[in-house]
């Protein structure tokens, strides 16, 4: 697949651009509702784009079929804040504005109902953008309520974590 960049807008629209030329490739026919897009991430295989929305849902788009929405995942009680893919592109982990972490089976298009402990300990994630979870324990300052950290990115070799917080650190 050609490399693409996905851009989500406040009105729920998504546009796809070629990279690095930034030529517009397409706008998927179906909007992700009318709510703001809060995050987007391609699967490691590059075949699926996961979009997180302020309608509390995750949209799975088929990158090889003009970004047609394949599945819509429901379950969060607030807007979807972060999305991470497993290395094998089989699972998603997501978090939301209510600080819920959920796991999803991409093939089934459903919330993963297996043993949560085994997913957390046995799954290798392509990267880590959730502001919650074992790999990022200790990123919040003492006495923090957890809302100070706005963004996290763990390197693929799992050796570094970059954190952006309200204090500019």
Name each model-derived stretch.
Residues 1-169:
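WD40-repeat beta-propeller superdomains and closely related acidic/aromatic-rich repeat-like regions
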């Amino acid at each position: 697949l050609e490399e693409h960049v996905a851009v989500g807008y406040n009105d729920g629209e998504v546009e796809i651009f070629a990279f690095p030329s930034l030529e517009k490739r397409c706008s998927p026919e179906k909007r992700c509702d009318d709510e703001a897009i809060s995050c987007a991430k391609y699967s490691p295989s590059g075949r699926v784009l996961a979009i997180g929305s302020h309608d509390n849902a995750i949209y799975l788009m088929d990158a090889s079929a003009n970004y047609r929405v394949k599945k819509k995942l429901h379950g969060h009680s607030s807007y979807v804040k972060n999305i991470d893919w497993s290395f094998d592109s089989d699972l998603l982990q997501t978090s939301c504005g209510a600080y819920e972490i959920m796991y999803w089976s991409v093939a089934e298009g459903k919330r993963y109902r297996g043993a949560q402990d085994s997913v957390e300990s046995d799954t290798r994630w392509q990267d880590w953008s959730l502001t919650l979870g074992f790999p990022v324990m200790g990123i919040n300052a003492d006495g923090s309520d957890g809302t100070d950290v706005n963004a996290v990115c763990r390197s693929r070799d799992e050796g570094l974590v970059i954190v952006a917080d309200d204090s500019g650190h």
